[in-house]
Amino acid sequence: MSEVTDQHGAALRTTRELAQAISSVERGGPAADALIQTALTRLASERSQNAVVIGVTGPPGAGKSTLVGALAERARAADRRVAILAVDPSSVQSGGALLGDRVRVEERPGDEGRFVRSIATRGSGRSLSHTAAAASLLVEAAGFDLVFIETVGAGQADLGIVRLADLVLLVEGPEGGDEVQAMKAGLLESAHLVVVNKSDRPGADRAVERLRSGLALGHDAPEVLLASAVDGSGVAELLTALEGLAVTRSGGGLQRRIAAHLAAAVEARAAQRLRDAESDGRLAELAQSIAAGERPLSGAVDQLLKGS
């Protein structure tokens, strides 16, 4: 694993240290900023190929976690260094991930070539969480060359993965109906590859045909594949297809992830300033002054963003 050391002496030599670094980023503060900046400095000077980041999205129950686990096992068998970041819904009280490390990956103690971590969304809205964007940079700087980011589920918030990932894999189940929701959310338009998981169940072939028919009218429609994370059928072909797409989309990945981190950081800071203004009463005071005609709305917005 590559070594990344911040000004406080923390190094990403092991997966344990990487986990601690991500925890530091979740807490925020100067130590987190130093870690991220050092990772960015190293990535900017790295001459080798950057990591391939694959966003995995789809409706709950489609088997995203199990499929990601199967893809990771296959990639690891080919000596790829694989990291999985599972974006979980946040607890309102604690801000932590509710589901924990839900990804189905066989534990291999001592294997420094795989890393699994749950990341809290922290109410990020349409964007991925600030932590998820930062964590993707840290795992890349730590030497992982294949990164899966699994989102919560098909919906408007999952469109944030498009900003961050090199490729977007949309996972659908065989039951039908979920593809309509994916179309409404714009995920089918954003996906680079679509897979119907659970091909061992009835209805999988029909789901593939429905998706292909729905995508046929679009420009540059993504390929639709069949796979089963349970019996392993189609997993190797799916990984090969993803790797092939990664080659065609090589270049610009690091800049994309830095832009995603920057956007998420700005959103997080603005949200924190709004929470602060609400808790100390400034938000109510500004609303009162606007209602009284003493202050324009745009001026109040600027004042909140400045934190004054």
Question: What are the language-model segments listed below?
Answer:
Residues 2-54, 59-62, 71-157, 164-170, ...:
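Nucleotide-state-sensitive switch-loop elements of NTP-binding domains
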Residues 18-19, 32, 208, 235, ...:
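A general structural signal for well-ordered alpha-helical segments in protein cores
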Residues 67:
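Hydrophobic positions on the alpha1 helix immediately C-terminal to the Walker A/P-loop
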Residues 111-114, 188-194, 221:
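Acidic/polar active-site rim loop that often engages polyanionic ligands
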Residues 139, 151-191, 196, 201-210, ...:
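Conserved P-loop NTPase nucleotide-binding/switch module
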Residues 193, 199-248:
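Canonical P-loop GTPase G-domain recognition
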Residues 237-308:
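Long, well-ordered amphipathic alpha-helical subdomains in the mid-to-C-terminal portions
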